[in-house]
Amino acid sequence: MSPQRLAIAAAQYPVDLRSELGAYRDKLARWVGEAASAGAQMLAFPEYGAMEWAGALGVSVAQDLSASLQAVSDAMPEMDAALSELARRHGVHILGPSGPQGRAGGRFVNAARLFAPSGRVGVQDKMIMTPFERDWGIAPGTQLRVFETAIGRIVECLPAHLLREIVLA
């Protein structure tokens, strides 16, 4: 059953040039710890927040879009493990920072991950691309997912014009 009230913490923080992936994991851990201590049950990180990792992967990677997309995509399992552990440790739901995820045919999607206190719940590929995403060659997702959680149904990356369809379903 869903709680009557749901405390949500939305991350708004400066994007930093990190020298290593561990520093970025530490930043996530501090933010999750502070939000959970303040009573947040659901934590949301920024869209494309995972691209902050590109700086920790080296200047040559950070300055090359193709290299950044691939490197951040390759690093996502490490981020997934860290966020899954943080969700378990703090008993919160986390909408992790989205980022590029490699798909068949060498294409990338903008994938958002949702983690429950039990671990990873699922992944939603963004379906409606912005002009810059089209310029980058980011492919749209093809399926809208609804995640059943202890705090209720959650839909990620939802364009406003689809909301009516979801509510009526």
Task: Enumerate the language-model features and the residues they cover.
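Active-site catalytic loop in hydrolytic enzyme cores
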Residues: E85, R103-A169
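Short, basic, glycine/proline-bearing loop/turn elements
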Residues: Q12-S19, D64-V72, I151-I154
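Residue-level recognition of beta-strand->loop/alpha-helix junctions
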Residues: Q12-P14, P46, D125
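Cys-nucleophile CN-hydrolase/nitrilase-fold catalytic domain and related Cys-dependent amidase chemistry
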Residues: L21-P117
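Residue-level signal for short, function-critical loop segments
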Residues: P14, P100, A160
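Active-site micro-motifs of SAM-dependent methyltransferase domains
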Residues: V15, A50, R164
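Short beta-strand segments enriched in small/hydrophobic residues
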Residues: S2-D16
